[in-house]
Each structure stands twice: as structure tokens, then as C-alpha cells.
Amino acid sequence: MNQEVMNLFNPTTPAPTFDQIKISIASPEKISSWSYGEIKKPETINYRTFKPERDGLFCARIFGPIKDYECLCGKYKRMKYKGIICEKCGVEVTLSRVRRERMGHIELAAPVAHIWFLKSLPSRIGLLLDMTLKDLERILYFEYFVVTEPGLTPLKYRQLLSEDDYLRAQDEYGEDSFTAMIGAEAIRELLRSMDLEKLAADIRVEIANSTTELKPKKLAKRLKIVEAFQASGNKPEWMILTHVPVIPPDLRPLVPLDGGRFATSDLNDLYRRVINRNNRLKRLIELRAPDIIIRNEKRMLQEAVDALFDNGRRGRVITGANKRPLKSLADMLKGKQGRFRQNLLGKRVDYSGRSVIVVGPELKLHQCGLPKKMALELFKPFIYARLDAKGHSATVKQAKKLVEKERPEVWDILDEVIREHPVMLNRAPTLHRLGIQAFEPVLIEGKAIQLHPLVCSAFNADFDGDQMAVHVPLSLEAQLEARVLMMSTNNILHPANGAPIIVPSQDIVLGLYYLSLMREKEPGEGMMFADMGEIDHAIAAKAITLHTKIRGRYIGVDADGKRYSKIYETTPGRMKIGELLPKHHKVPFDVVNKLMTKKEISNMIDTVYRHCGQKESVIFCDRLMSLGFYNAFRAGISFGKDDMVVPAKKWQLVEETRTLTKEYEQQYNDGLITQGEKYNKVVDAWGKCTDRIADEMMKEISAVKKDPETGREKQINSIYMMSHSGARGSPAQMKQLAGMRGLMAKPSGEIIESPIISNFKEGLTVMEYFNSTHGARKGLADTALKTANSGYLTRRLVDVAQDSIINERDCGSNNGIHMRAIIDSGQVVASLASRVLGRTAVEDVVEPATGDIIVPKGTMIEEHHIERINKSGIQEIKIRSVLTCETRNGVCGTCYGRDLARGTPVNMGEAVGVIAAQSIGEPGTQLTMRTFHIGGAAQLADSSFVETNFEGTVRVRNRNVARNSEGDLVVMARNLAIVVVDHDGTERAVHRIQYGSRLKVDEGDTVKRGQRIAEWDPYTRPILTEVDGTVGFEDLVEGQSMSEAVDEATGIAKRVVTDSRSVRGADLRPAIVLKGKDGKVSKLPRGGDARYTLPVEAIISVDPGQTIKAGDVVARVPMESAKTRDITGGLPRVAELFEARRPKDAAIIAEISGTVRFGRDYKNKRRLTIEPTEGGDAVEYLIPKGKHIHLQDGDVVEKGDFLVDGNPAPHDILAIKGVEELAAFLVNEIQEVYRLQGVNINDKHIEVIVRNMLQKVELDDAGDTEFLDGEQVDRIELAEANERMKEQGLKPATGHPVLLGITKASLQTRSFFSAASFQETTRVLTEAAVNGKVDPLDGLKENVIVGRLIPAGTGAQMNKLRVTANSRDDLILATRGESEEPSMVEGSADAAE
């Protein structure tokens, strides 16, 4: 009883627990049952008394009292009358909070259609009635009648009649012989008279009997909606409203402003219109007004209700007094400002503050400096409690006074309160989980938050005015999670790639680099030291310097933990760093006995973390930081003008290039090359020149000068130190300072031909300065635009992947994907070892030479395995992948592998989907913000040759080469590859060489590292001849299919193939044929004529009658001129891949292996058929004539070969080559974009996203399931249905996976809450309501929305415990029920209640 007295003012009823939420269409009875009364008047409140009008929109009788426990007229006040209804004003005496919960309703005089079911495409009413939207609107808005009961007349059921037709029919057949209705009543009648079961059966018969392609699809849609109504228990006529619910008044408030005016929610205006029109309609009906007036009023009522539900969906937008569209109920849910995204997924938080950040170098890694003022405010409740407990104050009021006066005891108590109470720091934008971390606060004076320098890279923070927010975790659980999971000391590794993120940068790196320098002939060279004490002494006495070569004794630990000492040749500086190393046998002094660049420091921290654990690494990093800062300060490194060394050979190189470009101009003037080729060559020449000058500059800057007398090395160039150590600046920036700025891009992305020859030291000319302004501006504009794009990409990724949670240890799958090293133009860009680290092997990994097992099946591949894999020369390993994981909901731990942020196997309940989305999205923003860092200087990325990285012997696969007139070996095959094998026959590298390249090596040659093995012209694609002969032209008609363009500048003609379609009646197939001595067309070696069909825009390189040799070029197809490869191409490219859009000029992929045949042309397309080798049907492709087809008649293609160049569409790869190939393609393409920017993301993140893009299966055969052929079904739903079929001995459904873009996949998740809060809210909710969908609340988003713990991390454990507890309760109750008498059970149940 005592408890109840205490809680009178805020009675806490336990929130009802639920496991799922169902949404369906509300019936009129349901709406009435929600309502507390009908609203009859449009009035809101009385303007004099400010009391709500009775029966109005704010009526207290319907919605409840305005003040707590007080009726409107004031007769009953206070608690003792709780629950009494005042006889005078009719208001119940209760809490005013009920005004947020109680609903009312409006009874409509005429039914109206619900606009969502009418207009939200596809129109549900339209589909169900099989009528077009246009016809429906004609009926609803009172233009046409519809026949609902034809009687014996020749009229048809559902036939539309205009007013005149209707009157005519009445005259003709008599008034009572048929019934025709108009407006929503008519539609309601049609919907009510539907027999869904019969309709469904009829449609199924129709689908079975239909012959055309389109009809079944249309019928299937209709069948789906009919079955949805049957299954969900919704009745079709409920889509027409007879009652309109009115939401509680406190959710659409009317607030008095100062000056006697009111601010009101738009909903009140919209409701008022509905009530006014409804009342007027009632009155008109009572008055028996003419039909036309009543009809007009009904139409207006329909429009008013439409505007209330979704303003602007149909017809004009209804605007308020200030011409602003009114916010309807639908607008309250939609978009960034709607209920879902503004209030449910993102909330404002109390116990938080924000301030500017400053650097706190004396803090430990787990600390942050919190201003006292902020702490006092944030921890107020804790302080009050502690003051009370210590007896400093008796009441909260007294405590408040003490705190306000800032008495000395308050500060002592604040210290106690804060001790070991972590706070969370957050820097916006929070792009990945490292954007919020927990720290222990240290009280400081001042008003700025102090941040530890090493966590800056995780927050992406700098101290130029950034602000950060502080949040206080209140409950014990929250504090525990903050400490155990979110403490900055737990986030040493980056979740995207597993590399350390607590890495020194800038000054610290510079200090450590300076410390580890070794110089010749310094004082005291060759001295020997026993320990650090001696070294410090010697430095203090100036007997040695930090960079002297000395011999020092380092005491290490061996594998058994015994100490040993060893003498190293080193420097005092390196000994200082070595002193900080934790003692461990796997962390020897060699780790620091080298020049410490940023990369080396990162490797060192990684080594320490892997072997010595977290605690040691944190202490090590902190000490490293102090050492670095101190030595950077002691070194006093800065740079002046003389440090920017302009290379001596610069002008010589520039002159050489100028001569070269003059030569190209001359070739162009002589007509040897085209304008486009000249442009490409000039740009290329300047690009090479810039690089060579940069190399010269780097040589000169990095050269170590010696004192001629003593031979002592001088101080290294400061700029070089900064760049080489990785502290600041890149070679690209140094090139601009002291080399040559190089080529610039126009805003369009084209490169300007004339480069900037000056550098910043020399200063730019006016012309050069003007050319360079493009890049700078484009950079700034790009940044602004791309930040938004990147944020949107992250949002879509999170939405598609949020359900991927680790839900079981091992799914037991034996499938996986094959991993190989990624080689790009001969360079190994991602080694096999780096790709398989932290993944699980599907099969034993065996060393090829000895047959030893390196990694047993089902074991995770760790660092120590990697060394052996690298040595053994294994080419391919099959590993488990989330793509082939068989877990129903979520993913299993074994398929996922290592948790990159911890370096251990992934924990149960880890939200790997969100981590993947963040890892891919975060650099997106980074990259976009970094576009202009090179100041728009164009970076060319065109290769025209292949060099090998390995020594060995050359093997040529698919060797098909010819010697051309110049005696070069020319590649004639489409799939020729050069393989370099080492002495024991292991393949070291495979280079695909493109058609038309000139080979520099041949079968059996030996090659050295860096030797060029092939080269080609990067600007044109050649068409080569395979036989010798004399040239003849076919269908090359001047002015129709070929134009002789005379270049104005040179006066020389060149022949270009043009599009003959533009000339009427000309069906020309331009080609070059080769004729033998007898004048007949030569035959190719593999049969077929030597006829080369020419694509549009090909430039012909030969003349008729000319004699040429095999391997010579007959025509060239120009490539697009070089554009700068910037991440600008990158971000849209990544989005395009994840959205699975078909590229503009998609490649055409062979679906089967077979022989190519060309058939008759079809209009403006060429017909290409592949006759399969194995037998079966031939496949036909129609290819536009402008596309260059590589193949000749009779060529043999493999399944999956490209028939036409271009970017392949991912859907085709999936259909032809399967899931593994698709995943490999997407992973490689996306990685390429990030790699270009030097961003490292682990493959598994991309795989997680791709898994979610493959959620749906398209059924080839629905078997005996409830699905239809060709329908797209969720993978899990299909598996469940097939299990049911197997149990019943029926035929299961079969299908093939389909690829959906991330937006589409997010909208088709099983959870309608998640989809509705993502995009297209109206459509998602409409569809869910019609289907009577149940949201099982499995994902993260749904649970955040309904305010429960998310089913990941600690929430997953809580869920598990709840499930176990429930099942245990059921068990106990069941056993109790068996043992005792039934009556007893009833009694005990009552007692429990």
C-alpha cells in the first residue's frame, strides 16, 4: 500500500512487453472503438476564456481535462475525486496526460476513399477492382456513374456512364431496371460485393491458361493483392472511410503566443475543413438540396479528407495563410524531419554538453580534460545525492544552493563523483563507431575540453576550432558498457582494416624520425655503452650526439622469459626508443633499430599489440607520444626557402619536352596523327616530364651532403624529413613547391594541354596562375557536394546491412570462395596473405613442395600461418565467407572470421552489418573531402606497357602472334597471357596482354625484375590483319559510310568511318578485305574470310591496293582522351556498384561457350549468334553498329567472355557466372576505387553488403508453395516454405538468386518499420497495411524505433536470457500442472495475478 501512496503523482505502469507489431487497415468499428466521442464543431477554443469549446476539436469532455485532476468548470478539484465525471461539464477528473492518448472521430455524411490506397502506386483499389486510376478518379470525383447492378438491361457490370449516358439509359430502360452509382459510395459497393475466394481461383486459372509474356505478370500482381486481403483479414471496403479518426489534441497543439495570437499545428486547419464541409453536407442532405449541389459538396469533402491524410498527393496543394503548404498526417512521418527520422531514430539527449577542444598532451590515453563548470552541471544529480549522504544538506533545495554558490565542499564531492565515472565524447560527423569513445574525466580549469592527441585520427579531429559533445552514461550498466566496450584504450585497431589507429602522427612522427636518424662521422663514433645511463651521461657531456653510430647493449627476454643481453650497432636515439619497448621475445630490438617512418611506427605498434596485449600497447603508445613530442621540440626542425631545392636539370628536361611536343604538332600538321591523338601524346609527354623533374628534385633533396674537411654528414633537408617520415606533406606537394606544378584539369575534367612549368618557389606567371584557379575552385565545390553524397551512401549501406548480426558460432557450411592475390598490370596490389588473414579455411591449406598442412580445415588463418603461406608460393586458398554462410537470420562467426577491431574471433551478437557499412561509408566522406589536396594538379593514370616484378622464365598461354612489317611480335589473341614461372615451376605472375600489343619477350625467354615484356598504344585500339595480302575496301562509300576529313590545319586527308544509318536506304556494312595474289578474298587460318568490319569512328590506316603483312594495323579506333582519375569518379562509381545499376555502355557477355556467327543485320543492329559447342539452343545478340565487336566469324568464345567492351552489368555476371564471380567482381571494382586513394578496407565488409543485396530469390518453379512462378521471395521465407513442403511431402520451390541495389534491398526487408523509416514511407506503410504485415522486430532499426534494447551486443545477450527464462517458466508451469490438481493450478494462477 505504501508504494501506491508514494507513486500517486506519477503512477508507473510497467510498459507492456511485446515481441512483434502488426499493421493493418482500420475498420469503421475499430475507429469508433478508439474514439472517446464524436467531434461535431470546427471550433477550437473560446477566444475570451481560452477554454476549449464543447464538441470542438479540443473538447475536454471527449479528450480529457486541461489541468491535472480538475474538471473544466472547476466543480471537482484534487485527487480525491479521481475518476468522477462532472455532471455539469461532462469532463472526467483525471491526469491531463490523457489528452495525448485519447482519440476522437468524425462521422462522415458520405463515405470517402482513403487517398493512400487510391493514389499510392500501384493503386490498391485499382488493382483489386481491375480498373484504371483514371476511371476510379472519374467515379470518385463525381464525373461518371458506374453500373453496380445491370439487371436485365444490356449494360455491363462496372460500365462507366457519363451524366448524359446515365439519363439516356434511365429513359430507355426505365429508372428501376438497373442501378448506377457515383462517388465513393459506388466504389464501396463494388468492393463490398467482391468474392475474394472465387476471384483468386479465377485468376489462377487465367494465369495457367495465358499465352502472352506480359499478361501473367499483371495477373500475378492482382492475385497477390487479392490473397493479401484474404490472408490478412482486411476487408476491401475498409479502404473507403466512413469514420475519420481525430488524433489527440496535445499532439496537434494550439499555443498562445505573446500579443494575443496563437500558433497552431496545421492539422487543426485540415481537420476544420473536413468538419465544416461534413456539417454543410449533412445540412444540405436534410434540406433535400438539388443533386448537383450535394455532389459538389461530397467532392469537396473527399478533397478535404485527401488533404488531411496526404496534402498535395492529388490536385492542388492546400496552403495556409502565408502560402505555405499545410503539413498533413503523411508529412508528419515522411523525410528527415518526420516522426521516424527526427524523433524515433535520433533523439536529443539530456546530461550532455559541448565545447571547443584543445590538445592535452599530458593526459593518459584513457583520460580527457573536462572543464569544472561543465562537470558541475553534468553530474548535478550525483552531487546532490552525495551532499545529502554526507550530511552537508538535508533537502534538494539546500543542495542546489550549495552547488550554485560553488562552496569548497562541492568541489571535493565533485572529485569523488567523477572518480572512475567514464564520460563519452563525440565529434560530429560521427562517420564510424570510433566517432564516440569513452574517457575518464580529469577536472581542469578553463572552458575547453582537453583531448588526447593520439585519438585525434579516430575522431578525425584537429584543434582549429573543432567542437565535441560530452555525454554522461547514467545507469550502472551504461557505465559498465562505456568502460568495457567504448573506452579509448579498447579501440586501438581500426574496425575497417585491423591496422592500429592509435598511431602517432605529425610532430610525434617527426620527433621519432629525428631520434632514429644515423649519421656518418659524428663525434664519438664506434663507442660502446652498457646501458641508457651511460648514454645520457655521454650526451650531456657532448661526447656523442643522438645520431652517432655506437654499439649499445640491449637487454631482451627469450621465449622462456629469461633475460639476455646482446650488443647492437645502433644510435643513442634508437636506444632511447628501444628503452620504451615492452620486454617480449617476439618484440626484439630490431623492431626499432631502423629509420622510424610513420609506416614503421605503425608496424611496431601492431607488433607490440599482437604479442604483448592491450595494456602494454597503451602504455607504450603514451610513452612513445611523450618521447616524440619532446624530441620534435628539441630538434627544432623548420624549413626555409633554401630547403626547396629546384633541380638543376629542370630546364633541360622542359626543353626536351618542348621539342617533343613541337614534333607532335608537326606530325599532326603532316596528318600522321589526329587531333585527339596529338592531344593525348602532348598531355602524356608533359606528364612524364613532370614526373622526371619530381624524381630529380627528390634525388637532390634527399642527397646527404658531407663536410669536406671532417667528412661529417650535414643536417638532412627539413622538407625531405617531414615528407619522408610521413609527418606532413607528400611528394606530390613537394613537386609543386620545388619541381614543376604540372598539368591542370579544366572543371569538366579534361586536362589543359599547356602545363604549369613554374613551381611555387619560382612563382607562377599570370597565365599559369589563371589556369591553376580551375582546380582550386573545383576542389572546393566538389567537397561541398560530395560530403552530402557520401553521407547518403553511408545511410543506404547501414539500412541494407543493419540486420546482419553474428547469431551463431558456426553454420557448418562447406562452401566458400576462392581467394587469389590481386594483380593489376603486373603489380601485386593485394597479396593473397593479406586477403586471407583472419578468415577461416574451408579445406586444408597444403604446402605444394612438401605436402605439409599449413592450416588445417576449419581453422582461422593467423599471422604465423601467413609467413609460411608467403614462403610456399600458394596461389589460391578457399576460405569461408559470409556470402556462402547458411545462417538463417544474420551471419555465423566462423564465416565472418576475425573481428578486425579486436584481432580475435568475432563475438556473438556483433553488429557486423553496421560495422561494414561504416567502414565503407567513412572513407567515402574522407575521400571526398580530400579531392582538392593536390590543388587540382592532374594525376594521369594511363599505362602503356607491362613490366614484370619477378625473375623467371616466360610461358605464353594461348599463343597467337604474328610478325608485322616492322618485325615486331604482335599479339593476335584476345586471351593471351604471359606467365612468369620461377625455377621450381611455381607461377609467380600472370599478365593478361591486350590484343594488338607488341611483345618484347617470347616463350622460354628469361626475364629480370622490372623488365618490359609488352607495350601498346594506350590511346587507340587497333584492328589487325591475320594474313598477308592486298587491301580492298567494301561498302566504304565516300559521303555515306566514310568521310575523308581534310584537317584544316594540315590539309591532309584521313578516312574516317561514319554512321551510314543517317543516309536513307543505305544498308552498308563497311569493311576492309584482304585479297590474295589471285584477286580473291583470302581465307583466315581458322576458316572464314579475311574481312574486317569497321565500327563507326574508326580511322582507316591503309589505302586500297596496299600490300600488308599479318600483324599490321588496318584501322584504329580512338579511345576517349585521358581524364583525370579523381575519387570524383570514385564515389559515384561505388554508389553505382552498390545500387547495381546497369552501366550506360554495358559490356555484352557470352552466356554460353561456342562458335560466333554473324547473321543478317536487323535495322541498325548487328546480329551475332553463338552456336554452342555442347549442343543445345544457339543464343542470339543484337548489337548496335557503333559498338566495336572484337570477334570475327568463326571465333570460339568461352562462357563469360566479353563480346563487346565496356563495364559488365553485375546482373549479367550473377546470371552467367554465379554468386562467387559476382562477389569477386564487386569486391575488386569497389576496392579499386578506394585503393586509388590509398584507403584500405577489408574485403569482408564489402561481402557483408553484397550478401544483403542477394537476399531475394526469383522462383523458376514455385512447386506446391503458396508463391507464384517468377515471383521474388526472401531467401529465408523460401527456406521456411520449402521446409514445410518437405514435411508434407510436397514439391518445394526452386529459384535463382537476384541482385538488388542497396536502396531496393532496404525497401524490401522483412521489417516494414525499417523500410518505412528509410524512404518512401507512404508506399511502404500502405503495402504493409494491405498485407497485414507483422514486424518481428529482428533488426536494429525496428528495435530503436519501438524503444527496446537492440538485438546486438549486450542486447543480444539480454534477449537470449529472456528467451531462456520464458522457456524455463513454461517448463516449470507445465510440470507443476502435471503434479498438482487442476483446481490448485487455477488458484495459484489467481494468486500470481
Curated annotation (Swiss-Prot):
Zn(2+) 1 binds at residues 71, 73, 86, 89. Its EC number is 2.7.7.6. Zn(2+) 2 binds at residues 811, 885, 892, 895. NCBIfam families: rpoC_TIGR. GO terms for cellular component: DNA-directed RNA polymerase complex. This is DNA-directed RNA polymerase subunit beta'. Mg(2+) binds at residues 462, 464, 466. It holds the Pfam family RNA_pol_Rpb1_2. Gene3D superfamilies: 1.10.132.30, 1.10.150.390, 1.10.1790.20, 1.10.40.90, 2.40.40.20, 2.40.50.100, RNA polymerase II, clamp domain, RNA polymerase Rpb1, domain 3. Belongs to the RNA polymerase beta' chain family. GO terms for molecular function: DNA binding; DNA-directed RNA polymerase activity; magnesium ion binding; zinc ion binding. Binds 1 Mg(2+) ion per subunit. Binds 2 Zn(2+) ions per subunit. Its cofactor is Mg(2+); Zn(2+). HAMAP family: RNApol_bact_RpoC (MF_01322). It comes from the Bacteria. It catalyses: RNA(n) + a ribonucleoside 5'-triphosphate = RNA(n+1) + diphosphate. One of its GO terms (biological process) is DNA-templated transcription. The RNAP catalytic core consists of 2 alpha, 1 beta, 1 beta' and 1 omega subunit. When a sigma factor is associated with the core the holoenzyme is formed, which can initiate transcription. Keywords: DNA-directed RNA polymerase, Magnesium, Metal-binding, Nucleotidyltransferase, Transcription, Transferase, Zinc. It comes from Azorhizobium caulinodans (strain ATCC 43989 / DSM 5975 / JCM 20966 / LMG 6465 / NBRC 14845 / NCIMB 13405 / ORS 571). DNA-dependent RNA polymerase catalyzes the transcription of DNA into RNA using the four ribonucleoside triphosphates as substrates. Transmembrane segments: none annotated. Disulfide bonds: none annotated.
